[in-house]
Amino acid sequence: MRQSQILPTRQQTVHRSHRMSESLLPVILCLLSAVTVAATNMFVKRGGDVLTARMAVAIVMGLSVLPFAPFVPTPPPETWSLILISVVVHWFYQFCLVRALHRGDLSLVFPVMRGLAPLVTACAAIFVLNEYLTVLQSAGLLLASLAIIVFALPTGQTATARKLDRSALVWALLTALGVGMYAVADTRAARAMPDPMTFVVWLFLLDWVGVTVVAVIQRRGQIGEAMARQWKGGLAGGMLGTISYGLAIYAYTLTDAAVVTALRETSVVFAAALGAIFLKEGFGYRRIIAAAILSGGLLLMQAGA
């Protein structure tokens, strides 16, 4: 057999390298998104007043994309319904997120609400996007879900603390539902746009309205004073949030929605670490092991793609 038949040609090598680069791009985007989304939620939780902090983040995200609005393509008329669906789903997610962060530790509720999201996304994507997981991806998803359950188990608190944890867990589960819903809705909308940046801009321009209305009603005459205490964290969290979800939306156009969501959920490790370091929240060896298993399950999902 000739050597040319054994060794790959230069064209084959370049093609394989190109395919590897294409497959790595969504991974890199999602991991960057994971770090920034964990930091965003830390700023929201650190602000104390979670509702006002989330409002500040949403407003900054809207303002950050405003300069780009004149330069992105106008959404086609048939896509406006998709944009509005995404906005409403994001409002639902934000409300549940605020309640979850208000009730529980960042290192507890964040892994649950983010880690279960791939399961919701995978189920919804079957019906909405006609996307199916492979056997290996399904195994990784189940492994990750089991790790999350272990991560979220109580750590011997008093009866009152356990009650608060159960309440936080319910809101975290609803937030996971919201994450899965917006992942599928945003994937469908972003793919229908002439450019992903169009969807990023219009989503963030409209997204801040819901949480702002709720915050103004809840805080009434104290909203100005509350915002004065939150603007620093809101500025940092808002800029990070824009980067985080902007990267995710671009990744949605490159690969399956469930894969993107799963890769972003490696943020649970970053969130737990940030909660322990900056917010003085408990962590422990069990959560360290569970977080490692969770990451392994999510990586297994990517390996099966």
List each language-model region with its residue ranges.
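Specific alpha-helical transmembrane segments that line the substrate/conduction pathway
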Residues: 85-90, 102-149, 198-206, 257-277
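C-terminal appended segment following the main domain
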Residues: 241-305
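Membrane-interface interhelical linkers
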Residues: 2-88, 94-106, 153-171, 205-237, ...
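Hydrophobic alpha-helical transmembrane segments in multi-pass integral membrane proteins
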Residues: 65-73, 121-133, 177-191, 240-257, ...
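Hydrophobic transmembrane alpha-helices of multi-pass small-molecule transport proteins
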Residues: 62-65, 122-128, 136-155, 286-305
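Alpha-helical transmembrane segments of multi-pass integral membrane proteins
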Residues: 143, 147, 168-186, 203-207
